Curated annotation (Swiss-Prot):
Its biological purpose: Component of the transcription coactivator SAGA complex. SAGA acts as a general cofactor required for essentially all RNA polymerase II transcription. At the promoters, SAGA is required for transcription pre-initiation complex (PIC) recruitment. It influences RNA polymerase II transcriptional activity through different activities such as TBP interaction (via core/TAF module) and promoter selectivity, interaction with transcription activators (via Tra1/SPT module), and chromatin modification through histone acetylation (via HAT module) and deubiquitination (via DUB module).
GO BP terms in the entry: chromatin organization; regulation of transcription by RNA polymerase II; transcription by RNA polymerase II
Segments of skewed composition (Polar residues): 37-58
Stored CDD domains: HFD_HFI1
Keywords associated with the record: Nucleus, Transcription, Transcription regulation
Region (Disordered): 1-58, 352-383
A Pfam family: SAGA-Tad1
Binding partners and assembly: Component of the 1.8 MDa SAGA (Spt-Ada-Gcn5 acetyltransferase) complex, which is composed of 19 subunits TRA1, SPT7, TAF5, NGG1/ADA3, SGF73, SPT20/ADA5, SPT8, TAF12, TAF6, HFI1/ADA1, UBP8, GCN5, ADA2, SPT3, SGF29, TAF10, TAF9, SGF11 and SUS1.
One cellular-component annotation, GO: SLIK (SAGA-like) complex
Molecular function as annotated in GO: transcription coactivator activity; transcription coregulator activity
Cellular compartment(s): Nucleus
Protein's UniProt name: SAGA complex subunit HFI1
Organism: Saccharomyces cerevisiae (strain ATCC 204508 / S288c) (Baker's yeast)
Anything else known: Present with 7950 molecules/cell in log phase SD medium.
Length: 488
């Protein structure tokens, strides 16, 4: 079976030199760049020989005929889905395998009929798909169609001026500056054109450009307050609140203050004052800064740094206990390492054996009175040596428990990684996980005293008002609350 011909003749009709799949028994899977090459040779129309441009070696391929033929085979709905899949693949949002799977679903014939004609139809779709991808790839390596009169419909999925569904545009004969700008804008991708439209709308309606790059640049530039109201200017002069030139100098003095990372020390009072005055001027505050504000900021900085050091110490202690040894409760109810508890038990056992040995020695001493003096001297020496050894072990243990541990930069880094709310402006978000709060439904105690309400229903009051204000007693209020909180 020969290839499906184009439904309507076009001024520039492309030729497909590749043989049909039926004649060559060749099948190409969608998404594979293995199809025959598409020729860029075009036959000019006899009626427009004068206006047709000569086809050079870098001439772009007219994809309009292939697109129309593929649209007629797929249908409008399938073509829309196919164009979306190809666009996602070209943008890199679909892999080659995903493209093949999606196109298999689009090109698959209906489940009701699986005849030979449907197989040939599928082969024709695969052939046109491969030729279309090769044509798009070939056009991407050739000159831009903008500026020419004949092939403006060869790019995009039928968005050119030669598409019969689109309104024909008038061609201006004179090459004006506006037309040049228009062609440059139209050559940009769709996302960039939409960004230009948004900038134009925001600049015209709101009077300000809400562009992220522009806003970032404005945030980095120091802001100097300017007085535009005459009354405010009089008040500034009368109160001797300086001039815009002096305000700009205050801002520059704030920027010139050395940072703590440069001086390797906490800022002093003068540095705090200059920095606070500069920030106040940038935000339009032209008054004076009280010295007590500087003291408050200094205390806040000290407390902030102390909190970081405190969290770091707790983290180091926790990691040392967690990864060094297992801990358990001792006889006194205090947490102690398992190795130390085993050592204590071993020492106690050794002490018990020593006591038993001493008792046996005392019994032998009673039997031999003559040798008692010598043995007593030896015992005194042994006792004194054992007491000295135990005292030394106690001192070493005390020094081991009270030894000084230095914090390193790695410890600070680990602490800030575990508690990012210490340095990031998201403390309320990260600190919620450390508060231990529970939901309201988890706060209800199902084993409370209110469960004994059915046992005392006979003592329930009648809720009769004592006066016209309908105010009951405290006892009635308690029963009312119990009735509200319990189910009937």
């Amino acid at each position: 079976m020969s290839a499906i011909q184009s439904p309507a003749p076009k001024p520039l009709q492309p030729t497909y030199p590749a043989a049909s799949p039926a004649s060559t028994n060749a099948y190409m899977k969608p998404g594979l760049i293995g199809s025959p090459a598409v020729s860029n040779h075009t036959e000019p129309n006899n009626g427009n020989n004068e206006t047709a441009e000569p086809q050079g070696p870098n001439q772009r391929i007219d994809l309009g005929a292939m697109i129309e033929e593929l649209t007629s085979l797929l249908g409008k709905e399938s073509w829309t889905k196919y164009a979306q899949i190809i666009s996602l693949f070209i943008l890199g949002k679909l892999s080659r395998k995903e493209l093949s799977n999606e196109l298999e679903l689009v090109f698959s014939p209906s489940a009701a009929s699986l005849e030979k004609s449907n197989t040939n139809h599928h082969h024709s779709l695969v052939r046109l798909h491969n030729q279309l991808l090769l044509g798009i790839f070939a056009n991407s390596l050739r000159e831009n169609p903008l500026g020419r009169n004949g092939n403006e419909s060869s790019w995009g999925f039928g968005n050119g001026s030669n598409n019969p569904n689109n309104k024909l545009k008038r061609i201006n004969k004179h090459n004006s500056q506006i037309e040049v700008y228009k062609k440059i804008v139209m050559s940009l991708p769709l996302n960039d054109r939409n960004r230009l439209k948004m900038i134009t709308k925001e600049a015209g309606k709101r009077g300000f450009i809400f562009c992220s790059v522009f806003q970032a640049r404005l945030n980095n530039i120091p802001k100097i307050p300017i007085v535009t109201n005459p009354e405010s200017l009089k008040r500034v002069k009368s109160n001797n609140l300086k001039t815009p030139l002096e305000w700009s100098q205050d801002i520059m003095n704030g920027f010139n203050v050395p940072l703590a990372s440069e001086s390797h020390s906490l800022p002093d009072t003068d540095s705090f004052y200059l920095r606070m005055v500069g920030i106040a001027r940038e935000h339009g505050l032209v008054g004076t800064v009280d010295a007590r504000c500087v003291e408050l900021i200094s205390l806040a900085l000290d407390q902030y740094l102390k909190n970081i050091i405190e969290f770091t110490i707790d983290t180091v202690r926790y990691r040392r206990k967690k990864y060094s040894d297992y801990y358990d409760l001792n006889e006194s109810g205090l947490y102690k390492s398992v190795s130390e508890m085993a050592a204590d038990k071993r020492d106690a056992k050794i002490k018990q054996l020593d006591d038993d040995k001493n008792e046996d020695e005392c019994a032998d001493e009673a039997k031999s009175i003559n040798n008692g003096n010598n043995s007593s001297k030896d015992d005194i020496g042994d006792i004194s040596m054992s007491s000295i050894t135990k005292a030394g072990e106690a001192v070493n243990e005390e020094l081991h428990e009270n030894r000084t541990i230095s914090l390193t930069n790695e410890d600070i880094y680990d602490s800030l990684s575990i508690f990012p709310n210490l340095v990031e402006p998201s403390g309320s978000y990260y600190a919620l996980t450390n508060l231990g709060l529970v939901n309201d439904d988890e706060l209800v105690d199902m084993k409370s005293n209110i469960d004994d309400l059915p046992d005392f229903l006979n003592e329930k009051p009648t809720f009769t008002p004592l006066d016209e204000r309908n105010v009951g007693t405290r006892h009635e209020l308690n029963w009312l609350i119990k009735g509200i909180l319990t189910e009937d």
